[in-house]
């Protein structure tokens, strides 16, 4: 399987992202609302800052400086900033709350994950449970105010032991190995770019 080479901008944006996360050391500051590579704008790392920490020019500058302090000068041209409503910590809490409450109610979860670009938690519910789960989310006091996007989604197996008839028929069998290969290649290219830039 040939994996296409990543553009230099994507490699540099990934390297900047890896440095940012390493600088956080597992503790996200309240100013941080997520990050993603914006391929529509020159393959830049778009770091999201919470609106309440960027509502004045002084706060915005301080929040940007705080993020850039974790990124080496060689990659700072590959970074841009936008604002978002929810901090990453708030999204993590929403993720945990939604996962726990929906599992406790017996709804079939396909996935639960943070969507940095849209500043929400994506929740995939198996189609048979989707309507009831969506109604539960809207009615439940603990869930209704959270940044959740609930959709119907089939489960993708990560075990590999199911028969082909039990698997989603949209080519789902090859998705996980390909995604893993791309992640590994991206990490290797990011590390190589980091060594090259320093």
Give the ranges of each region predicted by the language model.
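Active-site regions of enzymes building and remodeling cell-envelope glycoconjugates
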Residues: 146
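Short glycine/threonine-rich beta-strand-turn micro-motifs
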Residues: 29-92, 106-139, 151-158
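A cross-kingdom C-terminal cell-surface attachment/processing module
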Residues: 174-196
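C-terminal segment of classical bacterial N-terminal signal peptides
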Residues: 1-7
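Ser/Thr/Pro/Gly-rich low-complexity linker/stalk segments immediately outside membranes or between
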Residues: 10-15, 198
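Short amphipathic alpha-helix segments
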Residues: 13-29, 89-107
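C-terminal low-complexity, Ser/Thr- and acidic/Pro-rich disordered "stalk" regions positioned immediately N-terminal
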Residues: 154-172
């Amino acid at each position: 399987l040939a994996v296409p080479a990543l553009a230099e901008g994507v490699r540099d944006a990934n390297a900047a992202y890896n440095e940012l996360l390493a600088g956080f050391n597992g503790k996200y500051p309240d100013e941080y609302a997520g990050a993603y590579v914006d391929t529509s704008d020159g393959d830049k790392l778009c770091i999201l800052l919470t609106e309440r920490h960027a509502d004045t020019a002084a706060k915005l500058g301080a929040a940007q400086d705080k993020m850039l302090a974790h990124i080496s000068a060689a990659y700072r041209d590959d970074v841009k900033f936008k604002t978002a409503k929810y901090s990453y910590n708030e999204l993590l809490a929403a993720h945990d709350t939604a996962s726990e409450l929906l599992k406790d109610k017996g709804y079939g979860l396909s996935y639960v994950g943070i969507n940095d670009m849209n500043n929400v938690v994506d929740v995939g519910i198996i189609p048979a449970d989707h309507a009831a789960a969506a109604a539960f989310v809207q009615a439940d006091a603990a869930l209704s105010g959270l940044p959740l996007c609930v959709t119907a989604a089939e489960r993708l197996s990560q075990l590999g032991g199911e028969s082909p008839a039990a698997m989603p028929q949209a080519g789902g069998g090859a998705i996980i190995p390909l995604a893993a290969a791309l992640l590994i290649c991206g990490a290797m290219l990011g590390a190589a770019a980091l060594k090259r830039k320093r």
